[in-house]
Amino acid sequence: MSVKAAEVSSLAERINWEKVDGLVPAIVQDFQSSQVLMMGYMNQDALAKTGETGQVTFFSRTKERLWTKGETSGNVLQLVNMSLDCDNDTLLVKVNPIGPTCHTGTTTCWDGDPQEESQMVWLHQLEQLLAARKSADPDSSYTASLYARGTKRISQKVGEEGVEVALAATSGDKAELVCESADLIYHLLVLLQDQGLSMNDVINKLKERHK
């Protein structure tokens, strides 16, 4: 039994299966962006299979069988970790989604809701866009041209924008400070992507230092 399977098995023992009539609600959340993707139900077999395979599996109440998300579309949900709420009757499942989660082709099952997206979700989407630009035609966008010019040029831009931020702060122009900070963060994100990193790596380091 893998470590992940053992952890899931231990979690299953804590669930109040009688209270949930054998089906525990499972809220699925993107591990990187914290965006809620979907909600499904798991019985004990679905939970065990999720732990064994590392791919999120539900119990389909309509088909009355186990259903691994993405088994036909390929848009699987790769398990990162899961936890129980305080009443031991609802799961929070954190995943790395491969492709869109909703059967309609949207990122989440709530994409039709006009609710305002969180800043972290938006930032994650920006990082995905920047990552896609790495393989784009250098003439197609400024970002693609930066990648084409290499790490040295990207690093130079980060340095230049850092100076611009400092000058804006010194001048006391708050509007200019916001604009220059946006430029700095954008170029920093490009540099991180160039090096195979993301803002999550930076955030994790900040969390580590905060302990």
Swiss-Prot record:
Any GO BP: L-histidine biosynthetic process
GO CC terms, sorted: cytoplasm
The UniProt record lists the keyword Isomerase: no
Superkingdom of the organism of origin: Bacteria
Catalytic activity as recorded in UniProt: 1-(5-phospho-beta-D-ribosyl)-ATP + H2O = 1-(5-phospho-beta-D-ribosyl)-5'-AMP + diphosphate + H(+); 1-(5-phospho-beta-D-ribosyl)-5'-AMP + H2O = 1-(5-phospho-beta-D-ribosyl)-5-[(5-phospho-beta-D-ribosylamino)methylideneamino]imidazole-4-carboxamide
Pathway listed for it is: Amino-acid biosynthesis; L-histidine biosynthesis; L-histidine from 5-phospho-alpha-D-ribose 1-diphosphate: step 2/9; Amino-acid biosynthesis; L-histidine biosynthesis; L-histidine from 5-phospho-alpha-D-ribose 1-diphosphate: step 3/9
> Sorted alphabetically, which Pfam families does this protein's record hold?
PRA-CH, PRA-PH
Q: What are the boundaries of the region Phosphoribosyl-AMP cyclohydrolase? A: 1-122
Q: Any keyword ATP-binding?
A: yes
Sequence segments annotated as region (Phosphoribosyl-ATP pyrophosphohydrolase): 123-211
CDD domains to which the protein is assigned, alphabetical: NTP-PPase_HisIE_like
What Enzyme Commission number does this protein have?
3.5.4.19, 3.6.1.31
Query: Which Gene Ontology molecular-function terms are recorded?
Result: ATP binding; phosphoribosyl-AMP cyclohydrolase activity; phosphoribosyl-ATP diphosphatase activity
Q: Which family does it belong to?
A: In the N-terminal section; belongs to the PRA-CH family. In the C-terminal section; belongs to the PRA-PH family.
NCBIfam families, per this entry?
histidine_hisI, PRK00051.1, PRK02759.1
State the protein's name.
Histidine biosynthesis bifunctional protein HisIE
Organism expressing this protein natively: Vibrio vulnificus (strain YJ016)
Gene responsible for this protein: hisI
